[in-house]
UniProtKB/Swiss-Prot annotation:
The NG domain, also named G domain, is a special guanosine triphosphatase (GTPase) domain, which binds GTP and forms a guanosine 5'-triphosphate (GTP)-dependent complex with a homologous NG domain in the SRP receptor subunit SRPRA. The two NG domains undergo cooperative rearrangements upon their assembly, which culminate in the reciprocal activation of the GTPase activity of one another. SRP receptor compaction upon binding with cargo-loaded SRP and GTPase rearrangement drive SRP-mediated cotranslational protein translocation into the ER. Belongs to the GTP-binding SRP family. SRP54 subfamily. PROSITE patterns: SRP54. The keyword Transferase does not apply. The lineage of its organism: Eukaryota, Viridiplantae, Streptophyta, Embryophyta, Tracheophyta. It is an enzyme of class 3 (hydrolase). It catalyses: GTP + H2O = GDP + phosphate + H(+). GTP binds at residues 107-114, 189-193, 247-250. This is Signal recognition particle subunit SRP54 3. It is found in: Cytoplasm; Endoplasmic reticulum. It comes from Hordeum vulgare (Barley). NCBIfam families: SRP54_euk (TIGR01425).
């Protein structure tokens, strides 16, 4: 995420406050650096000035008693003001299971509205809802085809028409159909336009009047920066918008400006889109978001993300297999799948305290994903016996040649994958796994040392070596959360 650049700049600015003597000049330089970072993210000038003024009111260096941790006070004040800048203070509507929740999506053409409808449905489907999609966009050619393709891929029921041109009629018919089918989350995708025009707002009003949605969500392109204020305000006044989803925050420098501008309209942001994949869709909670920007991480969010991908029963099964020393190629394959589902690794790094998404150099993340997919392609050409075996010697030269031919890869690629497997299998052998999985909330020094050996050097350096890893495990709250993390992230070392 480009927003990570903003977070990196703010973190570096706060590092100035660790100077031997924190005086007025240090504070001024720190605040100026933060202001520059926010301005580069297209946050409004007045908003930045207000933030600086509020921090200065809180951090009165001359009035602080001797021995006071000035750096901590500055960090806390910056965090609070960033939260205030992004927080509307208004809770958004939350769908409830067991009753039909009707949600209507509105937005300008090109904002990613139709894709976001599917992401929203998919997110709630994983939470146990029974979602459905209605395409009431009759303005854009290909809108129904796009929704149909997305919904089919995500296995979500959908409704639309190639013949009917009245969006109100389609919306009502789709609503009735899915109510009869006991869908508890009916999502209506409406038409977009290239600009805010009267025809668009009138159509939205008619669809809303006919369907009486529980929530109207405005989907907004995050790349427009502070111009988001006018857009969000116009839609809020014309369509009774109850929540906002900001998209395209993975590749634009103006995301911070867009988020702060929307917050200024008092419209709560509930999700942010961070990529094109269906899982590149994150719940937006202000405090964890700011904590990630400041390098404090978001461990509850990370664990929740892992649990949504690896259910609790599968985690227990995984730990049981590892405890028996059964680290197979099939298990490695499943963990590669889990890692790919978790979204960008840079995003995962930002959720760990003391880390930053800047840790993942540009281009390296793509290479890592390509490597995972390459290994999975190779394993697709293996037999069940080969995938489930714990004996590395089973893969003889003739088998390796056969797998290479079947997967369309070179023999050296197969050898590389097998070496990676052997390294991980050795680490998660029955002898080692009991030492690595925390017991009674603690990990031994030997276990921590083993973890350090298998972690990439740049990661170890970023977290501050052994002491940094120990601090991270302490913040995880003991064995329970640490076990969840280990269960969710195995296979990606």
């Amino acid at each position: 995420m480009v927003l990570a650049d903003v977070g990196g700049s703010i973190s570096r600015a706060l590092a100035m406050s660790s100077a031997a003597v924190v005086d007025e000049s240090v504070l001024r330089e720190c605040l100026n650096e933060i202001a520059r970072a926010l301005m580069q993210s297209d946050v409004r000038f007045k908003t930045v000035c207000d933030l600086q003024a509020n921090i200065r009111k809180t951090v009165n260096l001359e009035a602080l008693a001797a021995g006071t941790n000035k750096r901590r006070i500055i960090e806390t004040s910056v965090g609070k003001e960033l939260c205030k800048m992004l927080d509307t203070g208004k809770p958004a509507f939350v769908p409830k299971k067991g009753k039909p929740n009707v949600v209507m999506f509105v937005g300008l053409q090109g904002s990613g509205k139709t894709t976001t409808c599917t992401k929203y449905a998919h997110y709630h489907q994983r939470k146990g809802f029974k979602p459905s999609l209605v395409c009431a966009d009759t303005f854009r050619a290909g809108a129904f085809d796009q929704l149909k393709q997305n919904a089919t891929k995500a296995k979500i029921p959908f409704y639309g028409s190639y013949m009917e041109s009245d969006p109100v009629k389609i919306a009502v018919e789709g609503l009735e159909k899915f109510r009869q089918e006991k869908s508890d989350l009916i999502i209506i995708d409406t038409s977009g336009r290239h600009m805010q025009e009267a025809a668009l707002f009138e159509e939205m009003r008619q669809v809303a009047e006919a369907t009486k949605p529980d929530l109207v969500i405005f989907v907004m392109d995050g790349s427009i920066g502070q111009a988001a204020f006018d857009q969000a305000q116009a839609f809020k006044q014309s369509a009774s918008v109850g929540a906002v989803i900001v998209t395209k925050l993975d590749g634009h420098a103006k995301g911070g400006g867009a988020l702060s501008a929307v917050a200024a309209t008092k419209s709560p942001v509930i999700f942010i889109g961070t990529g094109e994949h269906i899982d590149d869709f994150d719940v937006f909670n202000v405090e964890p978001f700011v904590a990630r920007l400041l390098g404090r991480g978001d461990l509850p969010g990370l664990i929740d993300k892992m649990e949504s991908i690896v259910p609790a029963d599968q985690q227990s099964e995984l730990v049981a297999k590892l405890s028996e020393g059964a680290f197979t190629l099939r298990l490695l394959y499943e963990q590669f799948q889990n890692l790919l589902k978790m979204g960008p690794m840079s995003q995962i790094f930002s959720m760990l305290p003391g880390f930053s998404s800047e840790l993942m150099p540009k281009g390296q993340e793509k290479q890592s994903k390509e490597k995972f997919k390459r290994y999975m392609t190779i394993m697709d050409s293996m037999t069940p016996a080969e995938l489930d075996s714990t004996n590395p010697k089973l893969m003889t030269e003739s088998r390796i040649i056969r797998v290479a031919r079947g997967s369309g890869r070179k023999v050296k690629d197969v050898m590389e994958m097998l070496e990676e497997y052997k390294r991980l299998a050795k680490m998660w052998s029955k002898r080692n796994v009991s030492k690595l999985i925390p017991q009674n909330g603690k990990m031994s020094a030997q276990a921590i040392q083993k973890m350090l050996k298998v972690m990439p050097p740049q990661v170890v350096q970023q977290m501050g070596g052994k002491s940094g890893l120990e601090a991270l495990l302490k913040q995880l709250g003991g064995g329970k959360d640490t076990s969840k993390m280990l269960a969710g992230m195995r296979g990606g070392a």
